[in-house]
C-alpha cells in the first residue's frame, strides 16, 4: 500500500486522547501502521541510573499513533485533507490533496 503519510508531513490528530493536536511526523512505522508525531501521545519513560556518569530520571518521548487517527494538513489551505494519488504525464505517482486538488510535495 502506498504511503499517504510520510516523514516531515504536518498532520492533525482526528480521534483519541490528543484529538485536535497538530504536529510534524518524525517517523513512520509502515509494518505497524503507526507514526510518531512531535508533541502528540507523549509518554513518560522511567530510566534507571546507568553507571557513574548517567543519572536516572523520567524522560518524556512521543509514542507511536495509529495512522488511521491522523489526517494530513494541506500545505496550501492549512486545513486537514484526505489524500489521493495521481499519475503525472511523466509517469511519476504523486500525492494529491482531495480538498484542493493540489499536488503535495514530498
Curated annotation (Swiss-Prot):
Gene Ontology CC: one annotated term: ribosome
Q: Name one GO biological process term.
A: translation
Key words, A-Z? Ribonucleoprotein, Ribosomal protein, RNA-binding, rRNA-binding
Q: Does the keyword Flavoprotein apply?
A: no
- Look up keyword Oxidoreductase and say if it applies: no
Its biological purpose: One of two assembly initiator proteins, it binds directly to the 5'-end of the 23S rRNA, where it nucleates assembly of the 50S subunit. One of the proteins that surrounds the polypeptide exit tunnel on the outside of the subunit.
- For this entry, the protein name equals Large ribosomal subunit protein uL24
State which gene encodes it.
rplX
Amino acid at each position: 500500500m502506498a504511503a499517504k503519510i510520510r516523514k516531515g508531513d504536518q498532520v492533525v490528530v482526528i480521534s483519541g486522547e490528543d484529538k485536535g493536536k497538530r504536529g510534524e511526523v518524525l517517523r513512520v512505522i509502515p509494518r505497524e501502521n503507526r507514526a510518531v508525531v512531535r508533541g502528540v501521545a507523549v509518554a513518560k519513560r522511567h530510566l534507571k541510573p546507568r553507571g557513574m556518569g548517567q543519572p536516572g530520571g523520567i524522560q518524556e518521548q512521543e509514542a507511536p499513533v495509529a495512522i488511521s487517527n491522523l489526517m494530513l494538513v494541506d500545505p496550501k489551505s492549512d486545513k486537514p485533507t484526505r489524500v489521493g494519488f495521481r499519475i503525472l504525464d511523466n509517469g511519476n505517482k504523486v500525492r494529491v490533496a482531495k480538498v484542493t486538488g493540489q499536488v503535495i510535495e514530498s
